[in-house]
Amino acid sequence: PRTRQAIAYCLDRQAVVDNVLYGLVPVPDTYISAEHPLHDATLATYPYDPAAGMKLLDTIGWRDHDNDPNTPRHAQGVDRVPTGTELAFTYVTTSATQRRQVADILSQSLRGCGIGVTVFHGAQTEFYAEGPDGLLFGRNFDLAAYAMSTVTAQPPCARFTTIEIPDADNRWVGTN
């Protein structure tokens, strides 16, 4: 959880809102809008604060071994992570213009904290292909970005349950 928190501090979501969404929406702190009656305003939020993110990564054991924030950090005493493992992710998304713009901003902000990111833009047919070979539904990624919406006022909580994890039992079409 602390690694995820550090990553959240390192994501410049305001730059995404300003540059890709033209400032038309606030930066979300959960997948439920702050204006929604079920939004929990007491939840911890993680504003863009790369210094706090890097400090937390150091505390956890993700060390900047070469004093170069542009190279990935390495594990040194991170719980359940072999020493020397790079803090690096593969980020997959579609080749749509907005997805490219978002990936550029987020990957650059992560790299600024010493988190390695390799971005892969797949064709929609490749990205949404059925599992186990497809990128999204085959769960062949570390980070993935795609758009989802709902047509009801009820938040789509069921999308994030265990039964929605794509696998052979649900024909690789779960939404979690």
Q: Where does each model-flagged region fall?
A:
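Aromatic-residue hotspot detector
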Residues: 39, 84-85, 141-142, 161-166
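Ligand-binding pocket segment of bilobal, Venus flytrap-like solute-binding proteins
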Residues: 109, 142-145
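Short beta-strand segments
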Residues: 91, 145-146
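Append "and occasionally in soluble cytosolic enzymes with long acidic Gly/Pro-rich linkers
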Residues: 1-108, 112
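Short, glycine-/Ser/Thr-/acidic-enriched flexible segments
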Residues: 96-97, 148-152
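Extracytoplasmic/peripheral linker and loop segments enriched in polar/acidic and small residues
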Residues: 4-5, 17-18, 55, 116-132, ...
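A short, structural micro-pattern
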Residues: 24-26, 137-140
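Positions that flank functional sites
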Residues: 35, 72, 125-126, 151
